[in-house]
């Protein structure tokens, strides 16, 4: 398993608060579902286990390869649902893809749309998404309008790290800061590994989220042919920030 897959699983894979929402939308609008920013399959595999067909798109081929393996015949939870493949994987950039089919529902979980490089990146994605939806199809996008800001100093007040062990190596991902600037938010984590021999590595990882409100996303959607069709929320928990989910109709 690659380092990219391990870190993605540790930092993103256990989040489950939004899964019921995506299942509910799939039940309402039908499948196949286009999952944008699918990663290693947190949402796509959950939908497949519920019996929905999913096309999972992510720009990172290592993550997509891991998802492909997890969705294959070796995954008995999915095989029991259907003898046909329920998950199709695509390695592509959300700002520039052409799948040759249309979907009744496209979902963008976990603030993926805020990773696209600002208004131009979002516009490119929205044009792609619009072309891939059937008439009346729905695009559901999770965003974070605000985040609680903090910075860990000398370990004081640090959130608990996410820790896993793979092949004897301990991986720890420690959130150490959420900062804001004019463009958005910067999320900083400290990644640490310790081998069975005691060898230790430490590196910092930064993720930038573009600043985005539900109202602005609805305006940008209207400029690309969408109609605002409501909003819902994923509540915050003690460990995770909540999300505003914007519903756009093609």
Spans of model-derived segments:
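Conserved class I S-adenosyl-L-methionine
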Residues: 1-31
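A short glycine-rich, Lys/Arg-flanked "PGG" loop and its adjoining helix->strand segment in the class I
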Residues: 123-135
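SAM-dependent methyltransferase
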Residues: 140-215
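Class I SAM-dependent methyltransferase "Motif I" SAM/SAH-binding loop
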Residues: 37-39
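A short acidic, Gly/Pro-enriched loop at the edge of an enzyme's catalytic core
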Residues: 95-105
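Class I SAM-dependent methyltransferase SAM/SAH-binding core
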Residues: 45-96
């Amino acid at each position: 398993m690659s380092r990219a897959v391990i870190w993605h699983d540790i930092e993103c894979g256990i989040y489950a608060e939004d899964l019921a929402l995506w299942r509910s939308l799939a039940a309402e609008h039908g499948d196949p579902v286009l999952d944008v920013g699918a990663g290693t399959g947190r949402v796509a595999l959950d939908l497949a286990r519920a019996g929905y067909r999913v096309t999972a798109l992510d720009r990172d081929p290592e993550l997509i390869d891991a998802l492909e393996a997890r969705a294959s015949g070796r995954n008995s939870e999915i095989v029991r649902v259907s003898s046909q493949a329920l998950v199709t994987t695509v390695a592509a950039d959300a700002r520039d893809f052409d799948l040759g089919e249309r979907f009744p529902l496209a979902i963008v979980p976990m603030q993926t749309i805020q990773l696209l490089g600002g208004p131009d990146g979002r516009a490119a994605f929205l044009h792609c998404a619009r072309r891939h939806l059937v008439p009346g199809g729905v695009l559901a996008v999770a965003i974070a309008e605000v985040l609680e800001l903090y910075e860990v100093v000398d370990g004081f007040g640090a959130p608990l790290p996410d820790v896993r062990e793979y092949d004897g190596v301990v991986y720890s991902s420690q959130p150490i800061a959420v900062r804001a600037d004019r463009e958005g938010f910067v999320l900083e984590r400290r990644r640490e590994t310790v081998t069975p021999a005691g060898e230790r590595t430490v590196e910092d990882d930064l993720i930038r989220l573009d600043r985005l409100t539900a109202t602005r996303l609805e305006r940008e959607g209207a400029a690309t042919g969408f109609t605002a069709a409501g909003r819902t929320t994923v509540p915050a928990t003690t460990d995770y920030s909540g999300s505003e989910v914007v519903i756009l109709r093609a």
